[in-house]
Amino acid sequence: MSVLRLEHQNSMAESKEDEYVHKVYNEIAPHFSQTRYKPWPIVTDFLLNKPSGSIGIDVGCGNGKYLGINPDIFIIGSDRSSGLIECAHELNPKGYNVLVADGMHLPHPNNRFDFAISIAVVHHWSTRERRIEAIKHILSKVRSGGEALIYCWALEQGNSRRGYHEGMEQDVLVPWVLQDKKKKPQRQAKKNGKFQEKPDVASVPPQERAAFIAKWKREQEEKKLAEEINEELQRQKELEEEKKNTKYRYYHLYREGELEEDCIQAGGEVVRNGYEKDNWYVVVRKP
């Protein structure tokens, strides 16, 4: 492949990631952070089993939920989203060690850290070459013998509400609907007593009742039609609002065994692997 062609492909991939990853996470950061508060067990165990005094990095740390798991180790967190880094600062006013940094261009020294974690991040790079390069870059920061724990969304999510499964497209745009801060007006129930079931003709002279009933029926039909039109307009407005509040994030859904292949291609040695929370994970050691 020519250098120019490779540069063009990288440029296209970067544009896609900017549009469907970086911009989106900055837009949804506060809402996203509210849904990311419970640490996953295997990540927690990985961190708790590190020797006291170990130093590591969390690449794509989000709101920093893993940074305080083990008080006896030191972790520097980074994320491409300045919005999520702000959330990390807000969640820990005393201050996490976090910074805004691209996962492909980490400012840390090479061969320095005892371990790394990157949870649900690598799948956002939009080509295999870039995903392998991202893993390689993470490993470059870890000393020889150090380990990195990497999680990526799985293609095989048969028991998940998302319903992804083997045979489906692996490169997908996943919707995220922002919460509308404005309270939606509640629609009136159709049967709320607004319309009379029968006209009151007690005070109407007998000879005028037929005309009175006919007029009453017309008025009721007009009111009913007006309410139906109003409900439809309200429904269309809500759909437009939801469409405006829906943001799409790019994901590569990893099939079983694929993450291990990428870690090996990145120069690592697979120590163990598994499945948790609709994600494949790999612990990869730097030779």
What are these model-predicted stretches?
Residues 120-124:
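Short catalytic micro-motifs in class I SAM-dependent methyltransferases
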